[in-house]
Amino acid sequence: MKLFAQSVFCIAAMLAIGTASAAEMTGAGSSFVYPIAAKWAVAYKEATGNSLNYQSIGSGGGIKQIKAKTVDFGASDMPLSADELAKDGLVQFPVIMGGVVPVVHLDGVKPGELKLTGDVLADIYMGKIKQWNAPEIAALNPGLKLPAKEITSVHRSDASGTSFLFSSYLSKVSPEFDKKIGASTAVKWPDGLGGKGNEGVAANVQHIDGAIGFVEFAYAKKNGMAYAQLRNHDGQYVLPNLDTFKAAAAGAAWDKTPGFAVVSTDQPGKASWPITGATFVIMQKSATDGGRSKEVLKFLDWSYKNGAAMAAELDYIAIPSTVVTLIEAEWKAQVKDSAGKAVW
């Protein structure tokens, strides 16, 4: 954990270094996207000399900052509605997809050994299931020795797109969770311990015996955390990996959804991972500085065209080229400078 935390902060510092210029982009928001955004930014700076200062502050913070025009772009794992985009003069588009996974700290339990269902996960986070050897969990894991240990549920303390994806899934599979708690970036969890960012949730789970949390998959893998299998929409137990994320993403109807606002949780398909989602970049339609907006779009275009292999290394799914064509057409139509001229 210490090594990964240090690498995150070192990358953040490196991304922020450089002389201020029109080519130094600023962004803020999603911690879900941070591992791949950092990787892309380092490679892009090596290729072009242009830098990115990205703050991993959570999707809610990213939305606030782009609305306040304090950054060149925000990033959120919860898409804004068409009405909200229109109201605030914003445009959004997906940049990457990935998976959210339940992670646990249980002695002797290895990655992928524990099986959970959506309704059991919902009951844990509603505080209804309190012990790891509870009958509801034991029935799903007859070959696994579960301790008589109290469950500590860990959640996000900040406004979070990862929370939105997790709570969206739980709301779809548990009517009680949907009624009492619902899907949101700022979930009012009835119990448990909060952590700031995916980093904070991962750290809390690692330090608390008996803890369960939810993080983007790259954080689980980098920190060697024990993640669970989940029973998906088709009743199949699946492991989180690039193939199961791709299976869930395959049904995304980007071309038919206003504002590209696709939510891919609980997708049908025998191989689909049930908590899959996208990160969306959000920008002002009318840019105060057209040069900076153009540089952001150049960075994203480069990432779409050159970043797929880097994304796959971290188990993210690149946006298909057919969808990129649609996205870049939106750039031309909607992103303008202060004189009303197309930036792209």
Protein language model features and the residues they cover:
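Bacterial N-terminal signal peptides
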Residues: 6-18
